[in-house]
């Protein structure tokens, strides 16, 4: 599961608070159904092995969270889409999906990017050297200790016997289907402004949507077994 450049959702409620643990941390995850909502309670601890944190690219340690997420139980596809950054969904183990980073091109910053950089050029974590300390699950840890996925949660999907891996904030199911690729592709040539140089995937703006009838849509969604 990997999203490029544009992520769209229509509803997301999140509350998390870091909790210090003095015992072994175990995954806790529950799903409850309300009239029109599907709600998730989680401590944010994955049910699979993780990389070592802190590490060279990420100074944060994993800590238990208090996560409460509700999404529409009966989602409807809208005629309009909303571009967002940040958390876009939750996996079926209670770990959150957050593909985008908080970094933007900043030639004055030591690393060449910062939270206060040029908003026209947002950093793609998979194009960065060191990938900000991502582990083998394409995940790392935020400042508050929240372990979260930026791409395909390898350790999680390897233990599944189904394609359904989670829910997006708009209520639609998230599936991992082997061989299915995003329709966002890398541009040819060189950037004409901003961080001059070849389009190399360092920034989300290095990609464009190349759609066709056999590819998923601009929101990385599509039909699967009769459902969007």
PLM feature segments, named:
Residues 19-23:
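Sec/Tat signal peptide C-region and signal peptidase I cleavage site
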Residues 61, 132-145, 210-227:
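Short, low-complexity cationic-aromatic patches
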Residues 24-128:
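Solvent-exposed N-terminal domain segments of exported/luminal and surface proteins
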Residues 75, 101-103, 151-153, 178-180:
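A mature extracytoplasmic/lumenal domain signature
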Residues 167-228:
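Extended, compositionally biased non-globular segments
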